């Protein structure tokens, strides 16, 4: 009898515990789900948030649950506003997003938006950006005859556009804020109210602080390619640019790198710079190309 009773004890305990089963299930740890950092997207020249519907779809599909904010500021022609004005507007928009994400955020910034984002990382001493993904952005400036320029300045060519862009009036247009004429470097350094400052090419009181702020970033992901058709030279997306003979010098040959004026050399030394060149993609297709997303963007959205 004792043996039989001993065999029945486990069943008896199960019966006693049955009323408490719902409570036990509630107390059990939930299955682990990946929690992704919020993503902030900044558009480019003449763009709007609608242009990024495919990118939004890709992120939602591969990283479900990710909070993605495509900032709807300075759309269309408003994107011609001076870049410092845009930086201030975008700063006001990203501060509350970052405040709600103590684990950090990711930035995906397209074309002109990549320069806006780099300036944001420079002026914000409390940003928490993990990956700054610069998507086909003229990080070292622009020197090319594009349809945008022909529409805005129909009587000018790239060889004489410096006469407009390096004037106080010209600096009121965003395009001129990063116009970089390699044949008039002295004028660029003196007149550029934006690019020469965030590059640390011209002395200013905030240079040291801006460099320190920029170095808070976790990863700098640079994306571009030879078939872009707009960014000129296309290597500007990787901090390369023309010398006075219009020979492209790569990032490591640029003075801003050699002097580490805003932190590029430091970032590369710590393995924080990722370069992802891709051929066969035109400028307006970067944010909708699925292969590009899977290869160059998705791996950095932790």
UniProtKB/Swiss-Prot annotation:
Coiled-coil segments on the chain, per record: none
Sugar-modified residues: 60, 190, 206, 245, 289
Record note on what altering residue 283 to A does: Abolishes palmitoyl-CoA hydrolase activity
A GO MF label: palmitoyl-(protein) hydrolase activity
Subcellular location: Lysosome
Gene Ontology CC terms, in alphabetical order: extracellular exosome; extracellular region; intracellular membrane-bounded organelle; lysosomal lumen; lysosome
Matches recorded under Gene3D superfamilies: alpha/beta hydrolase (3.40.50.1820)
pH dependence of this protein's activity: Optimum pH is 7.0.
GO terms (BP aspect): fatty-acyl-CoA biosynthetic process
Keyword vocabulary terms for this entry: Disulfide bond, Glycoprotein, Hydrolase, Lysosome, Signal
Endpoints of the signal sequence: 1-27
Catalytic residues (UniProt): 111 (nucleophile), 228, 283
Cysteine pairings via disulfide bonds: 109-117, 165-176, 276-296
Keyword match DNA damage: no
Function comment: Catalyzes the cleavage of thioester bonds from S-palmitoyl-CoA or S-palmitoyl-N-acetylcysteamine (unbranched structures) but does not have activity against palmitoylcysteine or palmitoylated proteins, branched structures or bulky head groups. Conversely, hydrolyzes both long and short chain fatty acyl-CoA substrate.
UniProt similarity note: Belongs to the palmitoyl-protein thioesterase family.
Name of this protein: Lysosomal thioesterase PPT2
Gene name for this UniProt entry: PPT2
């Amino acid at each position: 009898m004792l043996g039989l009773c001993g065999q029945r004890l486990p069943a008896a305990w199960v019966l006693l515990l049955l009323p408490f089963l719902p409570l036990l299930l509630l107390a059990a740890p939930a299955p682990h789900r990946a929690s992704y950092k919020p993503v902030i997207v900044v558009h480019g020249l003449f763009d709007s948030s609608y242009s990024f519907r495919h990118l939004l779809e890709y992120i939602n599909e591969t990283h479900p649950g990710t909070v993605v904010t495509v900032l709807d500021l300075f759309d269309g022609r408003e994107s011609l506003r001076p870049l410092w004005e845009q930086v201030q507007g975008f700063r006001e928009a990203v501060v509350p997003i970052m405040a709600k994400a103590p684990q950090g955020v990711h930035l995906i910034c397209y074309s002109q938006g990549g320069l806006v984002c780099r300036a944001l990382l420079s002026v914000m001493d409390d940003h928490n950006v993990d990956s700054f993904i610069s998507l086909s952005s003229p990080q070292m400036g622009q020197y090319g005859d594009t349809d945008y320029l022909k529409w805005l300045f129909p009587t000018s060519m790239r060889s004489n556009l410096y006469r407009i862009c390096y004037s106080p009036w010209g600096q009121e247009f965003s395009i001129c804020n990063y116009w970089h004429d390699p044949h008039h470097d002295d004028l660029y350094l003196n007149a550029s109210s934006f690019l020469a400052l965030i590059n640390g090419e011209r002395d200013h009181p905030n240079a040291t602080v801006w460099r320190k702020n920029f170095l808070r970033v976790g990863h700098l992901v640079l994306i571009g390619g030879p078939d872009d058709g707009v960014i000129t030279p296309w290597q500007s997306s990787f901090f390369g640019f023309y010398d006075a003979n219009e020979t492209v010098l790569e990032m490591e040959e640029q003075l801003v790198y050699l002097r580490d004026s805003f932190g590029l050399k430091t970032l590369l030394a710590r393995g924080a710079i990722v370069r992802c060149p891709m051929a066969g993609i035109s400028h307006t297709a970067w944010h909708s190309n699925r292969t590009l997303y899977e290869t160059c963007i998705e791996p950095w959205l932790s």
